From Swiss-Prot:
Record-given protein name: Exodeoxyribonuclease 7 large subunit
Biological process annotations from GO: DNA catabolic process
Quaternary structure and partners: Heterooligomer composed of large and small subunits.
Gene symbol of the encoding locus: xseA
Protein family membership: Belongs to the XseA family.
Protein's cellular compartments: Cytoplasm
Keywords: Cytoplasm, Exonuclease, Hydrolase, Nuclease
InterPro entries cross-referenced by the UniProt entry: Exonuc_VII_L, Exonuc_VII_lsu_C, OB-fold_nuc-bd_dom
Species name: Campylobacter jejuni (strain RM1221)
């Protein structure tokens, strides 16, 4: 029996005995092919199976399935003779709620967000020209080789690269990643990249670990999360200081190429020359204006003008002082005259006599014989009787 004959017999056997199956599970990987066919893996807690839903059948489905969807499929088991790979051929599909992984992811994301672990205020800035860069990933991974190759291509030789080996898949991966992160964070690095290439949802799920997220948040070193592909989002992306869609994108973000640096230096040189020329032109204009000024205003002439100005000011001051003296003399004369007038009046008033009758000042015309009056001067007082 040839492999083809065996595969054909197995295909017939599977299609005969597994032709009306209801299958439930969570999508862990999916490809929506350009032909219109859908190819995806359906998994439970322990196993997964390859599935296909051809265009004629999936046109009746009212939604586009995605990783994390929990589905209920109807269909049959078949075998692809060329490869001997068996798969489930779905004829109908409906959602059965969120899958376990997606539900865990969303619940943790919501909780950490409420705690403030994703708050932009806590994000640390990335260095402009890093000199000590750490990379946490599997030392045997293709992602690491791609990153190192890209650094070499950029000819960025300012930085020393430190590799911290860690598991990036499986149940033990979170512990391994945390251990590598703590070690790297104690080495006073300029920046740290946590990286992993693409994979299925469950392959990347170790980067949704809560303990890992909290270690990333409290790290002293700025951290870039570079996990999977553009469409892959994990908790470490949200809590890190910067999210790169791929490991290679992290290198592009962090490192300038030699050409970029040379072009930047050329641009800076050009701007400095423009600034220098501008300053020189300003100083030349200033010197020109000063030379014109001194040409028409020689130093002796300037000194003569200043002396004349000082003489004029002196004359004005003398004039003001003379006016003030005359004004003060006039005021003094007025005060002296007023004083003399008051003094004369006071001396004359000593000879005046005041006549009072019954406590009131009386005129001579009002007095009669036998009236008793009081005669008062400034120095004495006498009682008298009118005859």
């Amino acid at each position: 029996m040839t492999p083809t004959e065996l595969n054909l017999k197995a295909k017939a056997l599977l299609e005969t005995h597994f032709d009306d199956i209801v299958l439930s599970g969570e999508i862990s990987k999916i490809t929506l092919h350009g032909s219109g066919h859908w190819y995806f893996d359906l998994k439970d807690e322990r196993s997964s199976i390859a599935c296909a839903m051809f265009k004629g059948a999936n046109l009746k489905v009212g939604f586009k399935p995605a990783v994390g969807n929990f589905l209920e499929l109807c269909g049959s088991v078949s075998l692809y003779p060329e490869s001997g790979r068996y798969q489930f051929i779905a004829t109908s599909m409906k959602k059965a709620g969120f899958g376990d992984l997606e539900a865990q992811f969303l619940a943790l994301k919501e909780r950490l967000q409420k705690e403030g672990l994703f708050d932009p205020r806590f994000k640390k800035s990335l260095p402009k020209f890093p000199k000590k860069v750490g990379i946490i990933t599997s030392k045997t991974s293709a992602a690491l080789q791609d990153m190192l190759k890209l650094i070499h291509q950029k000819e960025y030789f300012l930085a020393k690269i430190y590799i911290f080996d860690a598991l990036t898949q499986g149940n033990n991966a979170p512990f391994s990643l945390i251990r590598a992160l703590k070690k790297a964070d104690d080495m006073d690095l300029d920046v740290l990249i946590i990286a992993r290439g693409g994979g299925s949802r469950e392959d990347l799920f170790c980067f949704n670990d809560e303990n890992l997220a909290r270690e990333i948040f409290k790290a002293k070193t700025p951290i870039i999360s570079a996990i999977g592909h553009e469409i892959d989002y994990v908790i470490s992306d949200f809590v890190a200081d910067f999210r790169a869609p791929t490991p290679s994108a992290a290198i592009d973000t962090l490192f300038y190429s030699k050409l970029d640096i040379e072009q930047s230096l050329d641009l800076m040189e050009e701007k400095l020359m423009q600034l220098w020329n501008y300053k020189i032109q300003n100083y030349e204009n200033l010197l020109l204006n000063l030379s014109k000024f001194f040409k028409f205003n020689s130093l002796p002439k300037i000194i003569d003008e200043k002396i004349k100005q000082s003489h004029n000011i002196e004359k004005q001051l003398n004039h003001l002082l003379a006016n003030q003296m005359r004004y003060n003399e006039l005021k003094l004369d007025k005060l002296q005259n007023a004083y003399l007038q008051h003094e004369n009046f006071f001396n004359k008033s000593k000879k005046f006599i005041c006549i009072r009758k019954n406590g009131k000042i009386a005129n001579l015309e009002d007095l009669k014989s036998d009236d008793i009056v009081i005669l008062s001067s400034q120095t004495s007082q006498k009682e008298a009787k009118i005859l």
